A protein has these predicted regions:
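Alpha/beta-hydrolase fold catalytic core
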Residues: 1-59, 81-84
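Structural cue for short, hydrophobic secondary-structure segments
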Residues: 61-64, 88
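Alpha/beta-hydrolase active-site loop signature
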Residues: 66, 91-95, 160
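Active-site loop/oxyanion-hole signature of alpha/beta-hydrolase fold enzymes
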Residues: 74-76, 81, 87-130
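Conserved hydrolase catalytic core segment
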Residues: 125-166
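A catalytic-pocket lid/entrance helix-loop region that shapes and gates access to the active site
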Residues: 158-186
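Conserved serine/cysteine hydrolase catalytic core
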Residues: 215-245
Length: 245
């Protein structure tokens, strides 16, 4: 497991701007990675790490299908302030994690394998799990297995029954997702549209999501999405049935 320790948080003066305070409070205490394994090769799974590394039990927060671990920055910062260790991974092909060689590996068994590698690297006997959509699905699978280290689980935007209409909509959105954007603002406007179910969020949060959803590519003079379009492989065929777990 690899750790890169960020700069320690500095005390802010009374005159510090709200933007500066926001940026500092949303800086992870550590950033690290573990190695996952597919049938063909190893790959790097990146994560942010908040709070005390010696906390008795870690909280693992796992994002939805096209998102990344920085979605949980606000929650992670708040929980770390209460003495918890919070780890937020990027699933393969998202955020700072490596993309997979074979697009067919973007599937639930691989995600569960990668998260098991992360749990083992953390060394926590017990963990709490917070999962959104796909992250919740992974959590349910891991929590249901004998000997699971998952002791408590909080899930949203997912359940044991997945209606086919929702799967169709998700697949359509994924296939139509832009690969790059001219500006951060363009990325933000796109996210505001496709993530409208997130609810009424403040402007600073939408901006935060956008900043961590793209990466500037100087050779192409554009912002590239930090989501591998090949994850759409699972939706290559139309869904004509609901999924009952």
């Amino acid at each position: 497991m690899v750790f890169n320790r960020s700069q320690p948080r500095r005390a802010l003066t009374a005159s510090a701007s709200a933007e500066t305070r926001e940026q500092q409070s949303m800086t992870p205490d550590r950033m690290g990675s573990v190695r996952g394994l597919t049938r063909r090769s190893f790959h790097r799974i990146a994560f942010t790490d908040w709070g005390s590394p010696t906390a008795e039990r870690a909280v693992i927060c796992v994002h939805g299908l096209t998102r990344n671990g920085r979605d949980f920055d606000y929650l992670a910062s708040a929980l770390a302030g209460r003495g918890r260790r919070v780890v937020c991974p990027d699933l393969p092909g998202r955020g700072q994690s490596e993309r997979l060689f074979d697009s067919s590996d973007y599937a639930l068994p691989q995600y569960c394998s990668d998260m098991t590698a992360l749990i083992a690297a953390l060394g926590s006997v017990e963990i709490d799990w917070v999962g959104t959509s796909l992250g919740g699905l992974i959590g349910m699978v891991l929590a249901a297995l004998p000997g699971s280290p998952v002791r408590r689980i909080v899930i949203n935007d997912i359940g044991p029954y997945l209606p086919w209409a929702g799967l169709l909509r998700l697949g359509a959105n994924l296939k139509e997702a832009p690969k790059d954007f001219e500006t951060i603002r363009a990325a933000e406007l796109y996210l505001r549209r496709v993530l409208a179910p997130f609810g009424e969020l403040e402007d600073e949060y939408w901006r935060h999501l956008a900043v961590h959803s793209v990466e500037w590519k100087p050779e192409r003079q554009c912002y590239e999405s930090l989501c591998d379009p090949c994850i759409a492989h699972a939706f290559r065929n139309p869904w004509h049935y609901s999924v009952d777990l």
